[in-house]
Protein backbone atom coordinates (compact mmCIF):
# COMPACT_ATOMS: atom_id res chain seq x y z
CA UNK A 1 0.00 0.00 0.00
CA UNK A 2 1.36 3.38 -0.86
CA UNK A 3 1.01 6.76 0.78
CA UNK A 4 -1.42 7.77 -1.95
CA UNK A 5 -4.06 5.39 -0.68
CA UNK A 6 -3.97 6.31 3.03
CA UNK A 7 -6.39 8.87 4.37
CA UNK A 8 -4.93 11.62 6.54
CA UNK A 9 -7.18 12.80 9.33
CA UNK A 10 -6.34 16.16 10.83
CA UNK A 11 -6.96 16.58 14.55
CA UNK A 12 -7.30 12.95 15.49
CA UNK A 13 -5.04 11.17 17.94
CA UNK A 14 -2.34 8.91 16.75
CA UNK A 15 -2.86 5.34 17.81
CA UNK A 16 -5.86 3.58 19.25
CA UNK A 17 -7.13 3.90 22.79
CA UNK A 18 -8.56 6.53 25.07
CA UNK A 19 -6.70 9.67 25.79
CA UNK A 20 -4.50 9.82 28.85
CA UNK A 21 -6.15 11.01 32.00
CA UNK A 22 -4.58 12.47 35.11
CA UNK A 23 -6.09 10.94 38.22
CA UNK A 24 -6.02 13.28 41.16
CA UNK A 25 -7.57 11.17 43.88
CA UNK A 26 -6.83 7.72 45.22
CA UNK A 27 -10.30 6.48 44.22
CA UNK A 28 -9.69 7.43 40.57
CA UNK A 29 -6.39 5.51 40.59
CA UNK A 30 -8.08 2.43 42.10
CA UNK A 31 -10.91 2.48 39.53
CA UNK A 32 -8.37 2.70 36.68
CA UNK A 33 -6.53 -0.33 38.11
CA UNK A 34 -9.80 -2.33 38.30
CA UNK A 35 -10.54 -1.44 34.66
CA UNK A 36 -7.13 -2.75 33.65
CA UNK A 37 -5.75 0.54 32.41
CA UNK A 38 -2.06 1.25 32.50
CA UNK A 39 -1.42 3.14 35.71
CA UNK A 40 1.72 5.05 36.46
CA UNK A 41 2.01 7.11 39.63
CA UNK A 42 4.53 9.88 39.77
CA UNK A 43 4.94 12.56 42.38
CA UNK A 44 5.24 16.07 41.05
CA UNK A 45 8.03 18.12 42.52
CA UNK A 46 7.43 21.81 41.92
CA UNK A 47 10.05 23.59 43.98
CA UNK A 48 10.28 26.77 41.95
CA UNK A 49 7.56 28.55 43.85
CA UNK A 50 8.22 27.17 47.32
CA UNK A 51 10.79 29.69 48.49
CA UNK A 52 9.63 31.04 51.81
CA UNK A 53 9.84 34.66 52.76
CA UNK A 54 11.28 35.12 56.27
CA UNK A 55 9.73 38.59 56.55
CA UNK A 56 6.30 37.09 55.91
CA UNK A 57 6.90 34.46 58.57
CA UNK A 58 7.90 37.17 61.04
CA UNK A 59 4.77 39.21 60.28
CA UNK A 60 2.61 36.11 60.70
CA UNK A 61 4.23 35.44 64.07
CA UNK A 62 3.54 39.01 65.15
CA UNK A 63 -0.08 38.74 64.01
CA UNK A 64 -0.57 35.59 66.06
CA UNK A 65 0.57 37.32 69.22
CA UNK A 66 -2.63 38.67 70.66
CA UNK A 67 -1.08 40.76 73.39
CA UNK A 68 -0.54 44.40 72.58
CA UNK A 69 1.58 45.87 75.33
CA UNK A 70 1.21 49.61 75.83
CA UNK A 71 4.43 51.54 76.36
CA UNK A 72 5.44 52.07 79.96
CA UNK A 73 4.75 55.48 81.46
CA UNK A 74 6.31 57.44 84.28
CA UNK A 75 5.01 56.34 87.63
CA UNK A 76 3.05 58.29 90.20
CA UNK A 77 6.18 58.72 92.33
CA UNK A 78 8.01 60.57 89.54
CA UNK A 79 4.97 62.76 88.88
CA UNK A 80 4.66 63.71 92.56
CA UNK A 81 8.40 64.38 92.86
CA UNK A 82 8.27 66.77 89.88
CA UNK A 83 5.27 68.59 91.36
CA UNK A 84 6.88 68.95 94.80
CA UNK A 85 10.21 70.10 93.37
CA UNK A 86 8.53 72.64 91.09
CA UNK A 87 6.32 74.02 93.86
CA UNK A 88 9.28 74.24 96.25
CA UNK A 89 11.00 76.53 93.74
CA UNK A 90 7.78 78.50 93.23
CA UNK A 91 7.60 77.79 89.49
CA UNK A 92 4.58 77.21 87.31
CA UNK A 93 4.63 74.41 84.73
CA UNK A 94 5.30 77.04 82.09
CA UNK A 95 8.39 78.28 83.98
CA UNK A 96 9.81 74.77 84.28
CA UNK A 97 9.17 74.09 80.60
CA UNK A 98 11.05 77.27 79.64
CA UNK A 99 14.02 76.33 81.83
CA UNK A 100 14.37 72.88 80.26
CA UNK A 101 13.50 74.03 76.71
CA UNK A 102 10.47 71.77 76.34
CA UNK A 103 6.82 72.45 75.59
CA UNK A 104 4.47 73.03 78.55
CA UNK A 105 2.47 69.99 77.41
CA UNK A 106 5.53 67.78 78.02
CA UNK A 107 5.82 68.99 81.62
CA UNK A 108 2.08 68.48 82.06
CA UNK A 109 2.34 64.89 80.78
CA UNK A 110 5.21 64.10 83.18
CA UNK A 111 3.37 65.60 86.15
CA UNK A 112 0.20 63.66 85.37
CA UNK A 113 2.19 60.41 85.03
CA UNK A 114 1.07 59.60 81.48
CA UNK A 115 4.31 60.48 79.65
CA UNK A 116 6.57 57.86 78.10
CA UNK A 117 9.89 58.28 79.94
CA UNK A 118 12.59 60.03 77.92
CA UNK A 119 16.02 60.03 79.57
CA UNK A 120 17.02 63.40 78.10
CA UNK A 121 13.91 65.17 79.37
CA UNK A 122 14.23 63.52 82.78
CA UNK A 123 17.87 64.59 83.10
CA UNK A 124 16.96 68.20 82.19
CA UNK A 125 14.25 68.18 84.86
CA UNK A 126 16.63 66.67 87.42
CA UNK A 127 19.18 69.43 86.86
CA UNK A 128 16.57 72.22 86.87
CA UNK A 129 14.75 71.00 89.99
CA UNK A 130 17.79 69.63 91.81
CA UNK A 131 16.11 66.31 92.68
CA UNK A 132 16.49 62.71 91.47
CA UNK A 133 13.81 61.47 89.11
CA UNK A 134 15.42 58.20 87.97
CA UNK A 135 16.64 55.07 89.69
CA UNK A 136 16.32 54.63 93.45
CA UNK A 137 15.54 57.42 95.93
CA UNK A 138 13.20 59.31 93.60
CA UNK A 139 12.66 62.79 95.03
CA UNK A 140 15.97 62.87 96.94
CA UNK A 141 18.18 65.92 96.37
CA UNK A 142 20.81 65.59 93.68
CA UNK A 143 24.32 65.31 95.04
CA UNK A 144 26.85 67.81 93.77
CA UNK A 145 30.06 66.88 92.05
CA UNK A 146 32.15 64.23 93.78
CA UNK A 147 34.92 65.54 96.04
CA UNK A 148 38.45 64.40 95.36
Curated annotation (Swiss-Prot):
Gene Ontology terms: biological process: maintenance of translational fidelity; positive regulation of transcription by RNA polymerase II
HTH cro/C1-type domain sequence ranges: 82-136
Annotated GO CC locations: cytosol; nucleolus; nucleus
DNA-binding region: 93-112
Entry keywords, A to Z: Activator, DNA-binding, Transcription, Transcription regulation
Superkingdom of this protein's organism: Eukaryota
Keyword Iron-sulfur applies: no
An example molecular function term from Gene Ontology annotations: transcription coactivator activity
InterPro entries listed in its UniProt record: Cro/C1-type_HTH, Lambda_DNA-bd_dom_sf, MBF1_N
CDD domains the UniProt entry points to: HTH_XRE
UniProt region (Disordered), positions on chain: 1-97
Protein family according to the UniProt entry: Belongs to the MBF1 family.
Function statement: Transcriptional coactivator that stimulates GCN4-dependent transcriptional activity by bridging the DNA-binding region of GCN4 and TBP (SPT15), thereby recruiting TBP to GCN4-bound promoters. Involved in induction of the ribosome quality control (RQC) pathway; a pathway that degrades nascent peptide chains during problematic translation. Required to prevent stalled ribosomes from frameshifting.
Name of the protein in question: Multiprotein-bridging factor 1
Organism, as annotated: Schizosaccharomyces pombe (strain 972 / ATCC 24843) (Fission yeast)
Gene, per the UniProt record: mbf1
